[in-house]
Curated annotation (Swiss-Prot):
GO molecular function: NAD+-protein-arginine ADP-ribosyltransferase activity; nucleotide binding; nucleotidyltransferase activity; toxin activity
Annotated active site: R471, S501, E538
Further facts: In Salmonella spp. the spv gene cluster is encoded on a highly transmissible plasmid.
Species assigned in the record: Salmonella choleraesuis (strain SC-B67)
Record's protein name: Mono(ADP-ribosyl)transferase SpvB
Xref: SUPFAM superfamilies: ADP-ribosylation
Highest taxon in the source lineage: Bacteria
Catalytic activity: L-arginyl-[protein] + NAD(+) = N(omega)-(ADP-D-ribosyl)-L-arginyl-[protein] + nicotinamide + H(+)
EC class (word): transferase
Keyword Disulfide bond: no
Length: 591
């Protein structure tokens, strides 16, 4: 994405190896430039090791942009340099590579002339010939190869980047991924990454939206502007179901591919109510921000009217999940908006379990750290407020489980497919493993110790006098027909092999509501301050909890409305109660 934060063009998006940002947030102290920075990860699902490396980055020296002042989410790009003034859009211009380094043409030799004319790439033939010029960074550090392709018939231009790890990146292949002068389409200022492919045939496809006049008051100082230059990152699709060696964009401007994962950047086209999961398809036109602004770095106006309101992670496994587009996580962005300057004031995450259990929002942006003690040894804040509390390894394990380890651990315990690489990284980062290539026995033992620590941390929490808890499940899926049968047979004893998350506060709406009765001495514990998602008052039970099914009340039966009225439902209950198909009354067995 175009960085619009007031930096020079030499600080454009940096190319980074494909990897997922680590969980949580990283707040750094001021460096030699005196700037403070923070990084917030996006809700990106792992996919065989090849997933988009994107995150929200803040710098105290940044300007305004689609994420408010100081914030940016940069994708790979190549741009014309503006260090010597406005580009001339001819051979005299300098190009800046993805790492901000000036690019120079490689030498032309008899064995390797530069430029050359190409009619094909591998087995793919083109309807026109291209003049291909090879470039390299003036100061070599990344050891990638760059090619600038210009069509000899229509003049369309794009870049190919051959990375040292064998990954091929395509930048600006279509007009949607080029930042150009609306009055002169050949005056391209930036080429944005549009597709990447690995040697194994794994693809990532980036989609962009062009600025327009939707929801903008076109009177006054907005009258007569051509605002179509700006490009906003809209979707990142990856996890192609069928491997393909060649770039999809060689043959199609909009690849018709079965993608398994989609990261959606929403600019107000969908609702932002935390209680209502947004749909995959946009419902409305995007919203206009209160503080529109323009950039003129490249000799034409780049007008911005949008703010990214949320980032959504969807999975596409219709056979396994029972629906074409399944929301699994979202990052809600909240702004302090005014006509002068917009600031990001909160970022809240919502996670959606595979069984339909929704985790409540949590504020990801934390208060600033305390100031350092003054020279005299006194602090301007009471020391007790910032005291460091020593925690046992078991409580630390439980806290990490609550924040982001729950999905991997529970899939492992249930015997489901789980991201093994992510599990190893978790064990390594928390000192349960000493190598990232453990033997099967070492990995199994480390997981056993880690799970035992979580369970011990849970059992160390105080008992409660709660007698009823709730859990919402999504069981009306073809893949879960056997599970549904188990849960709808009176007298059955269900053994949950994983940690079981419930709430004594509210029943989160789904097709099945578990109304669970507790007896004195049960092993469930309220996580309280240990919980990462504190808004949901979570009671967690250890693995192998036994539940006996006592009765089932189906929708449409005589007692359904009466029992439904007695349940404490989530805040969006009035809109969603028609989704409830059954209430299952269960009892936790203590032995």
């Amino acid at each position: 994405m175009l960085i619009l934060n007031g930096f020079s063009s030499a600080t454009l998006a940096l190319i980074t190896p494909p990897s997922l940002p680590k969980g949580g947030k990283a707040l750094s102290q001021s460096g030699p430039d005196g700037l403070a920075s923070i990084t917030l990860p996006l809700p990106i699902s792992a996919e065989r090791g090849f997933a988009p490396a994107l995150a929200l980055h803040y710098s105290s020296g940044g300007g305004n942009g689609p994420f408010g002042v100081g914030w940016s989410c940069a994708t790979m790009s190549i741009a014309r340099s503006t260090s010597h003034g406005v580009p001339q859009y001819n051979d005299s211009d300098e190009f800046l590579g993805p790492d901000g380094e000036v690019l120079v043409q490689t030498l032309s030799t008899g064995d390797a002339p530069n430029p050359v004319t190409c009619f094909a790439y591998g087995d793919v033939s083109f309807p026109q010939s291209y003049t291909v010029t090879r470039y390299q960074p003036r100061t070599e550090s990344s050891f990638y190869r760059l090619e600038y392709w210009v069509g000899n018939s229509n003049g369309d231009d794009f870049w190919l980047l051959h990375d040292s790890n064998g990954i091929l990146h395509l930048l600006g292949k279509t007009a949607a991924a080029r930042l150009s002068d609306p009055q002169a389409a050949s005056h391209t200022a930036q080429w944005l990454v549009e597709e990447s492919v690995t040697p194994a045939g794994e693809h990532i496809y980036y989609s962009y939206l062009a600025e327009n006049g939707d929801n903008v008051d076109l009177n006054g100082n907005e009258a007569g502007r051509d605002r179509s230059a700006m490009r906003y990152l809209s979707k990142v699709q990856y996890g192609n179901a069928t491997p393909a060696a060649d770039l999809y964009l060689w043959t199609s401007a909009t690849p018709a591919v079965q993608w398994l994962f989609t990261l959606v950047f929403d600019y107000g086209e969908r609702g932002v109510d935390p209680q209502v999961p947004p749909a995959f398809t946009a419902q409305n036109s995007w919203l206009a921000r209160q503080d529109p602004f323009s950039l003129y770095n490249y000799g034409f106006e780049i007008r911005l009217h949008r703010l990214c309101r949320q980032v959504l992670m969807f999975h596409h496994f219709p056979d396994e999940l029972g629906e074409a587009d399944t929301l699994v996580s979202r990052l809600l962005l909240e702004y302090d908006e005014n006509p002068i300057l917009t600031q990001l004031c909160a970022a809240r995450t919502l996670a959606y379990e595979g069984d339909g259990y929704r985790r409540a929002p949590v504020n990801n942006i934390m208060p600033p750290p305390p100031p350092p003690p003054m020279m005299g040894g006194n602090s301007s804040r009471p020391k007790s407020k910032w005291a460091i509390v020593e925690e046992s390894k078991q409580i630390q394990a439980l806290r990490y489980y609550s924040a982001q380890g729950y999905s991997v651990i529970n899939k492992y315990l249930r015997g489901d497919d789980y991201p093994e690489t992510q599990a190893k990284e978790t064990l390594l980062s928390r000192d349960y493993l000493s190598t990232n290539e453990p033997s099967d026995e070492e990995f199994k033992n480390a997981m056993s110790v880690y799970i035992n620590d979580i369970a011990e941390g849970l059992s160390s929490l105080p008992e409660t006098d709660h007698r009823v808890v709730y859990r919402g499940l999504k069981l009306d899926k073809p893949a879960l027909s056997d599970v549904l049968k188990e849960y709808t047979t009176i007298g059955n004893i269900i053994i949950d092999k994983a940690f079981m998350s419930t709430s004594p506060d509210k029943a989160w709406i789904n097709d099945t509501i578990l109304n669970i009765y507790l007896e004195k001495g049960h092993k469930g514990r309220i996580l309280g301050d240990v919980a990462h998602f504190k808004g949901e008052a979570e009671m967690l039970f250890p693995p192998n909890t036994k539940l006996k099914i006592e009765s089932i009340v189906n929708c449409g039966s005589q007692d359904f409305a009466s029992q439904l009225s007695k349940l404490r439902l989530s805040d969006d209950a009035t809109a969603d109660t028609n989704r409830i198909k059954r209430i299952i009354n269960m009892r936790v067995l203590n032995s």
